[in-house]
Regions:
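A nucleotide-sugar donor-handling region in carbohydrate enzymes
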Residues: 108-195
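Structural motif
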Residues: 4, 79-80, 103, 185, ...
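C-terminal alpha-helical cap of glycosyltransferases
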Residues: 338-363
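A donor-sugar binding/catalytic signature common to diverse glycosyltransferases
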Residues: 10, 15, 22-25, 235-284
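Catalytic binding pocket for nucleotide-activated donors in carbohydrate/polymer assembly enzymes
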Residues: 254-335
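Active-site and donor-binding regions of nucleotide-sugar-utilizing enzymes
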Residues: 8-31, 36-130
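Catalytic donor nucleotide-activated moiety binding site of glycosyltransferases and closely related
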Residues: 204-234
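A short helix->loop->beta-strand "cap" motif at the edges of active sites that frequently abuts
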Residues: 99-103, 207, 267
Length: 363
């Protein structure tokens, strides 16, 4: 009999959180778990998950059950509950929880900071005294909770590497863009930044650039020369997004879910980290860069300064041109370390099995 897992998620201002939860849900389902996802705005899920129906408060998609947690009816709760990113589980659900539920996992946001290893898998306050609740801390070390390495995506990365031109021409067929070896392709999915200054710097370069803009908030109301082509792309679902970041030579990327997909391409990227008060986001960025440092044989200081200036909205165009003019194996090397040592799903399921089997023996 399949073990059951319920995942809870809020959609707040962007779709990164539900993107993480859906990707996790798919991997759990593929490993023979019965998966249900409860989300506060089910009508918006269809924007990133192709095939979901925005008009239904309940549906099954690719084997996973989706519920609107403002409007659902269930008879039982799962053996394992995962609450993502401090979401509040509805009282109507908690009222049904009984001893059949073995474990509640508080899935936190990704971090490279050292302190997360001390909190990973430590007890958290549980709404039910007879159910264990723990913190689960995703991260970039073997002692952390790891990151989501879904097999579909890793296979896609390899497939596009082998047949990039074919994928490229098919994906951009409607736009009439054909792959060219003398063009540098850049994907832009960021929060607001000084985009005009960056373009002005690119114009001074001998490179030919094509930019794919995935952020509709960027101001494109300025002129640029013929050797720079800019395409404002329509909103993309998760599968389309996975393809375009692998087709690009460089990714400007924001958030957690998109950042991890960019990291797993093995290609260069700059992470636009979510801004926090008192510059806490810069501390988090510095922590990640420090993890990344050992994979650079050269140019670490250049990349470090690029990352900071990008996130502080300083002009970094000349440094960017200097960086991309050189070849870097560091991104592929770091990807290999992550794939080998930081598989979140494997770590999570190992922990779940150890805890639920222990609870069963105690019963």
């Amino acid at each position: 009999m399949k073990k059951t897992i319920d995942l809870f998620c809020d959609i707040v201002d962007n779709y990164g959180d539900i993107g993480v939860v859906y990707r996790l849900g798919k991997e759990l389902y593929n490993r023979n778990y019965k998966v249900r996802i409860f989300v506060n705005k089910l009508n918006e899920v269809s924007k990133i998950i192709k095939g979901c129906n925005s008009r239904l408060p309940y549906q099954v998609h690719n084997g996973i059950e989706f519920f609107d947690f403002n409007n659902f009816e269930i008879n039982d709760t799962a053996e394992i509950i995962i609450e993502a990113f401090a979401v509040n589980i509805p009282e109507s659900y908690l009222d049904k929880v009984n001893i059949n539920t073995k474990l509640i996992i508080n899935l936190e946001y990704l971090s490279a900071e050292n302190w997360i290893e001390d909190f990973h898998l430590k007890n958290s306050f549980s709404p039910k005294p007879y159910i264990e609740k723990v913190f689960y801390m995703p991260g970039f070390t073997a002692k952390s909770g790891g990151i989501i390495l879904d097999n579909y995506y890793l296979n896609l990365v390899d497939s596009i590497k082998k047949s990039r031109e074919s994928y490229f021409n098919n994906f951009f067929k409607e736009l009439g863009i054909k792959y060219s070896t003398d063009t540098y392709y850049i994907n832009v999915f960021t929060y607001n930044w000084n985009f005009k200054e960056f373009i002005e710097t690119l114009e001074k370069s001998p490179f030919k650039f094509v930019l794919f803009i995935l952020d509709y908030k960027l101001d494109l109301n300025f002129s640029y020369k013929d050797k720079i082509e800019i395409y404002q792309m329509p909103f993309m679902d998760q599968n389309q997004f996975d393809i375009i970041i692998n087709l690009s030579d460089f990714n400007f990327i924001r958030g957690e879910e998109s950042f991890i997909r960019a990291l797993l391409t093995g290609k260069p990227y700059l992470w636009n980290i979510y801004e926090q008060d008192e510059m806490l986001h810069i501390d988090k960025l510095e922590a990640f860069l420090e993890r990344f440092r050992e994979y650079f044989t050269a140019d670490y200081n250049l990349y470090h300064d690029l990352s900071l200036n990008f996130n502080l909205n300083n002009n970094f165009g000349n440094s960017f041109l200097e960086f991309i003019a050189r070849k870097h194996s560091s991104f592929e090397d770091y990807k290999k370390f992550i794939v080998t040592n930081c598989n979140l799903v494997e770590k999570l399921l190992y922990f779940i099995d150890s805890r639920t089997n222990q609870n069963q023996e105690e019963i």
